[in-house]
Amino acid sequence: MVSSNFYKNLGPRKLTAIIDFLHDIIEPPKIHEDIAIHDIKILQEASPNDISFLSNPKYSEFLKTTKAAACIVPKNFTGEANPNTVLLHTQNSYFAYGKLIDFFYAPIKSYPAKIMKSAIVADSATIGKNCYIGHNVVIEDDVIIGDNSIIEAGSFIGRGVNIGRNARIEQHVSINYTIIGDDVVILAGAKIGQDGFGFSTEKGIHHKIFHIGIVKIGNNVEIGANTTIDRGSLQDTIIKDLCRIDNLVQIGHGVKIGKGSIIIAQTGIAGSSTIGKYCTLGGQVGIAGHLNIGDGAQVAAQGGVAQNIEAGKIVGGSPAVPIMDWHRQSIIMKQLLTSNSKLKK
């Protein structure tokens, strides 16, 4: 159940209004009685006043018994459902669900256009219109922050950093040596623009290499909580538009990540590697340094990548191999273990 402590329910909404809002309902059903929908709930918990959704077929059995007044389903869904539940077929039911959340809910917490008294803002910093600068934020010299941006409590914005419009920087984020585009979200605890892990070894001593690159983050990027992005040693670290980076990701110095790529939690990318456009790296993936991952490539969770990956390829395992080879290896290993167990008996 959604907590009213944190989110405001904007309902009820008429079912016809929901259909109009979603736009992409395929052959909208005729509504004989315009039902008032009060909330969004999962199939198992929905009441006759709620709407639900189905995006994963493993939950389709619950459509038979759900009490939901209506349910968003994929366009090709032909399974059984409660006859009292109105089915709304959409091109992308999960995307429609996300839109419905915005239609039904808003956060209670608001951010007035204000600089809190405890914030420290340098005289040479430029703060745009309608910005919120939270408690104990530090903004150093020559920083530029675009209009309608939010910098939450305890964050540090280092000298010369440029943040675009409509940014949301959550609590205790530190940003140095970085240029950020518009509509960027950075979740709590992220660290961006610090030195990378660069040392030269001479006579048994590891000497720090001064990093003179920066971090460049494009438009409409989200960076997860406690993720770290190092600035480049000589070439810049670059995150292109539309990327989604999960929590606890490590991005090394000089890494370049192409437009629209998705990187899942606990992934580490070593320095100077390039990730192409619209790539997907599963959880706990490791990418060695100085590699090239082609556009649209995918790496399954816990994959260890030590060689370049061609565009569009799907790999898994450690060391990573083509995904079907990895599946075969897993089956053979299981068969060997079973055979060995039988021999011992």
From Swiss-Prot:
Known catalytic reactions: a UDP-3-O-[(3R)-3-hydroxyacyl]-alpha-D-glucosamine + a (3R)-hydroxyacyl-[ACP] = a UDP-2-N,3-O-bis[(3R)-3-hydroxyacyl]-alpha-D-glucosamine + holo-[ACP] + H(+)
Highest taxon above the source species: Bacteria
EC class name: transferase
Database matches in PROSITE patterns: HEXAPEP_TRANSFERASES
Family: Belongs to the transferase hexapeptide repeat family. LpxD subfamily.
GO molecular function: N-acyltransferase activity
NCBIfam families: lipid_A_lpxD, PRK00892.1
GO cellular component term, pick one: membrane
Organism: Rickettsia massiliae (strain Mtu5)
Annotated CDD domains: LbH_LpxD
EC number: 2.3.1.191
Keywords: Acyltransferase, Lipid A biosynthesis, Lipid biosynthesis, Lipid metabolism, Repeat, Transferase
Entry annotated with the keyword Lipid metabolism: yes
Record's protein name: UDP-3-O-acylglucosamine N-acyltransferase
Any one GO biological process: lipid A biosynthetic process
Pathway, per record: Bacterial outer membrane biogenesis; LPS lipid A biosynthesis
Self-association and partners: Homotrimer.
Function: Catalyzes the N-acylation of UDP-3-O-acylglucosamine using 3-hydroxyacyl-ACP as the acyl donor. Is involved in the biosynthesis of lipid A, a phosphorylated glycolipid that anchors the lipopolysaccharide to the outer membrane of the cell.
Stretches assigned to coiled coil: none
Active site, UniProt feature: 253 (proton acceptor)
